[in-house]
Structure formats: structure tokens, C-alpha cells
């Protein structure tokens, strides 16, 4: 089926994904994919389908690749706190790499996915974290009553903030600082630790 990521040849998917990263959805074209892949436009059209189908397939490929790289980092850790910290370090490193590229070229993968392919990314992310949260519950690392689905969504949203929000009190260029920042708060957050309500002073404009 043209445009179905499950049946598409990897080289064309990679070419489509790279084209999307470099040009963005607005400038993306089947001709550009053909030039990247070194094939004819007709081959791209017959394989990927329409321009929209090609973009969708490229986004799906990028989403799967991002989750795969995240999984590789996470699987090296044994506790939920360390797993989330490792994911945060990876996303922060990705953020630094994106910042070093020329403006208008090579759009960041995560930003691209969050803006245009967020449904697949969010679904895959939640499915990635659910068994890890359940394992943490079994180990007693987080509260037994923790809802794995809700906790996974919370982890996902927190991690994506490392890409979307600028640093204030934490040095995102330091993997050690990122690990400590996440490790100090992730378990307490999932355990629902209660703290006295503190009055926050309003900042003058």
C-alpha cells in the first residue's frame, strides 16, 4: 500500500525523513525526496503515494526512530528515576545539537514531531513508559497506587519540556546537572509527596 510505513523500503523512508527535516513540511516535495534518494520522482510517487502520504510516512519513521533511540538509553538504567534522567539527558543533548544548526535548516526532529506528528509520538511515548512505571511500582520505587497510564503521560510531558522550554535554574548543557535535576524530583512527584503550601511572591512587571 503506497504510504503505509509498514510496507515501505527503508532507503526511501530515510530519504523522505531527511528531506522533511531539512526542508520542513511547507517546502517538502516528492521531487526533493527523489533527489535525496537518487531515484526518479515517479518511483517516489509510486512508493510513497501523495505528498501528504509521504510526509505522514516520514513523520512516522522519525517518531519510531526517536523512540528507539530513547529506549536504548533507558534500557541501560535500572531505576525509574535513572531511566527518566537518561531520557532527559538525551533530549537535552538533542536540543543542543539543534541549536548549533543554521537557522531554517535541518528542523529539530522532536520539534517537528511535536508540531506535526504528535499523536503517534505521544502514543508511542506512553506505551514506552507504562511497563517501566509498573516495574517501579513492583520494586517499591513509587507508590503502589500510582496509575501507570497517567504517570507515563506526566513523564512524557515533563521530558518534552526540556526541548520546548529554555533553562532557568538548571544547566541543560550539563548531563550531570540534568540527571540530578530529574532524579531529585521524579520519584517524589510520582509518590504524590505532600508539601506545605508556600506562598509565592508575585514578581513585579
Mark where each language-model region is.
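Generic hydrophobic, amphipathic alpha-helix propensity
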Residues: 7-19, 33, 54, 58-66, ...
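Helix-turn-helix
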Residues: 11, 19-53, 57
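Hydrophobic alpha-helical connector segments
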Residues: 57, 68-101, 114, 152-155
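C-terminal peripheral helix-coil segments that are non-catalytic and often amphipathic
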Residues: 93, 127-139, 158, 164-205
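Amphipathic alpha-helical interaction segments
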Residues: 11, 32, 61, 82-90, ...
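Short amphipathic alpha-helix in the helical subdomain of ABC transporter nucleotide-binding domains
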Residues: 5-8, 125, 129, 148-155, ...
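Helical hydrophobic small-molecule/effector-binding pocket
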Residues: 81-107, 119-130, 187, 191
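Amphipathic alpha-helical packing segments from all-alpha helical-bundle domains
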Residues: 67, 113-141, 149-153
